[in-house]
């Protein structure tokens, strides 16, 4: 084992940045659609339908019918989330401090060149306009499921995904459900600070607001209020996906891609720009790393993780490692091409500014985001992976500080992939 780790360390030191290939927008859209119920797998489609049915049931609650009025008032119930356990811990999430850190991290948004602003609008317009029906329906389900964890089930594969859905509604994942949702740092203050109008409010826009024929099924166009930058839904998607990936590292790559796909859904609906999504990815990654480095949070995380893993193994009737496996046909999130999709969502092909290429500096503790997925590597090796798989400098939110550079350029999917190849 020591020899294997030494070889990996040498390879990382010698390696040039290794990036997933850039793909055009139409290819990214096709990959986004490949993980919808349009996938050519009955097992996967059944999982998607079960997740949607459970979401609609949760949203309806004890009401006679599911109406739009209920959407703003729904959240995980006391069975699903053990909020009493979390409250009793007395843990302080330091929400305001983390919100201010997020605003500082995204400050480059205020000085974007006009070319980037125009391309930002052009890209959301194209994605929204050309999205196929199955992609739009997935986006609607993602949007209305923000208060729950159902959306993560499809990235677990058919067998583990179904076990997750069952255990979640039975309350067997209560600690994880409570902790994950409480770890979402609201983007509300950042939205007020940057005060950027949504794409469908820009004068002369051609955004198509998508009628809801999936969740409430009232054919009302999906819309959103408040500022556009950064995306609150994307912050939720990435936060939830990254924390579950740390709890179930057997599905790490698929869950990272699920976070990216959740953000893509916001653009499909025409309610967010690419930079809204990119900014929220940066903030969510920063926040999750912050929490996982806090020893007091780690105590809660470990307790929640252990409960979740035991419950899922019991529901599966086998080890979690075995339950997480599935054949490629039934598991589109494990298609290697999804790493190309994740790479696309890091930039959405927005213009890269020419200029110096500063050496990437990894913030202290950021490597914790790979710790659970790559426990055989040292902290130094995980930091080297992050450096050697990072995007080039110069993308719109890279900013001027080392921390802005890092979180814009961090490619977790590529770092994980390189580790698999070098091990």
Model-derived regions, located:
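Gram-negative bacterial Sec-dependent N-terminal signal peptides
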Residues: 1-19
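Residues in and immediately flanking transmembrane alpha helices
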Residues: 15-16, 246, 289
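Charged, amphipathic alpha-helical linkers/stalks
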Residues: 290-363
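Hydrophobic alpha-helical bundle signature of multipass membrane enzymes
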Residues: 21-268, 331-423
